[in-house]
Amino acid sequence: MAGHLASDFAFSPPPGGGDGSAGLEPGWVDPRTWLSFQGPPGGPGIGPGSEVLGISPCPPAYEFCGGMAYCGPQVGLGLVPQVGVETLQPEGQAGARVESNSEGTSSEPCADRPNAVKLEKVEPTPEESQDMKALQKELEQFAKLLKQKRITLGYTQADVGLTLGVLFGKVFSQTTICRFEALQLSLKNMCKLRPLLEKWVEEADNNENLQEICKSETLVQARKRKRTSIENRVRWSLETMFLKCPKPSLQQITHIANQLGLEKDVVRVWFCNRRQKGKRSSIEYSQREEYEATGTPFPGGAVSFPLPPGPHFGTPGYGSPHFTTLYSVPFPEGEAFPSVPVTALGSPMHSN
């Protein structure tokens, strides 16, 4: 800002001619005086700027919240080039205003606010750190004991998880047992799982039938429900019955199952799936009708053109040539191109 103003005044001749020694008039300030007033923040000017303008020098820098703050232009000078010397205040009044402005801020370093919140990292006490190390060492020793006991008795990690489900009603996966033995679980989860595994170790030592229970549970878990396959003849019969009665009662389901030689659950599930399929089909059909009612994105309509010979991806039309559907842009009446028969389309002819 100062450099811009100085450059503007550098090309304006001082009133009265000469080099400006004739004096200053209202509305104009000597650029040399203006430049002398602009010094380093908080420091003295290059020349007699403050003395010439009749103001007290800028007070020194003061500390503010751990940093250095400097005073800016004081005593409400505004744009100095637009203010004449006659309108400047005396030195006493200017100094008083500077003092009044500086009284609002303390020259001492600012103290901490009483309501200031300090975020400090909470470090555990030596006792807590010792307890944590002792707990981690105990978990490490128990994990080694569990792995040794499991291998000695011939249990797999999956067997341990299934046995916990038989004993306590909650099955744990093989991955969980593996991570516990490898100390890869969080400390919270390790502490939750440790009592259950301790009871498993006791049961494994005292109960000889635990291995048989584990094997039976493994067979139950391994038994998967096979996918039911229905013959085409039976499927057509079910489809015919569905058209007559989409939602049969329990007695009707039992009668249909006995008639077709199927289980009642199979018939019930088939009718339920068939109703859901019908709902999806009706929704798709309604969406298709709405799409056709609103019209295609291209107003010209669909036109089929034969594709050139060669391999094409798609389903052939039972020996008929492949066609592709294109949308033509409608032309105004009287401006359409004459129709060209399909047989006339072929390779371009070159004239000599």
Swiss-Prot record:
Record's keyword terms, sorted: Cytoplasm, Developmental protein, DNA-binding, Homeobox, Isopeptide bond, Nucleus, Phosphoprotein, Transcription, Transcription regulation, Ubl conjugation
Binding site for DNA: R150, Q157
Subcellular location: Cytoplasm; Nucleus
Pfam families, per the entry: Homeodomain (PF00046), Pou (PF00157)
SMART domains: HOX, POU
Covalent link Glycyl lysine isopeptide (Lys-Gly) (interchain with G-Cter in SUMO), residues: K118
GO cellular component: chromatin; cytoplasm; female germ cell nucleus; germ cell nucleus; male germ cell nucleus; nucleolus; nucleoplasm; nucleus
Mutagenesis or variant effect for Q211A: No change in DNA binding. No loss of self-renewal ability in iPS cells. No change in nuclear location
Region listing for Disordered, in residue ranges: 1-48, 91-115
Domain POU-specific per the UniProt entry, residue ranges: 131-205
UniProt DNA-binding region: 223-282
Polar residues bias spans: 99-108
Role played: Transcription factor that binds to the octamer motif (5'-ATTTGCAT-3'). Forms a trimeric complex with SOX2 or SOX15 on DNA and controls the expression of a number of genes involved in embryonic development such as YES1, FGF4, UTF1 and ZFP206. Critical for early embryogenesis and for embryonic stem cell pluripotency.
PANTHER family assigned to the protein according to its UniProt record, in alphabetical order: POU DOMAIN (PTHR11636), POU DOMAIN, CLASS 5, TRANSCRIPTION FACTOR 1-RELATED (PTHR11636:SF86)
Protein name, entry field: POU domain, class 5, transcription factor 1
Organism per entry: Mus musculus
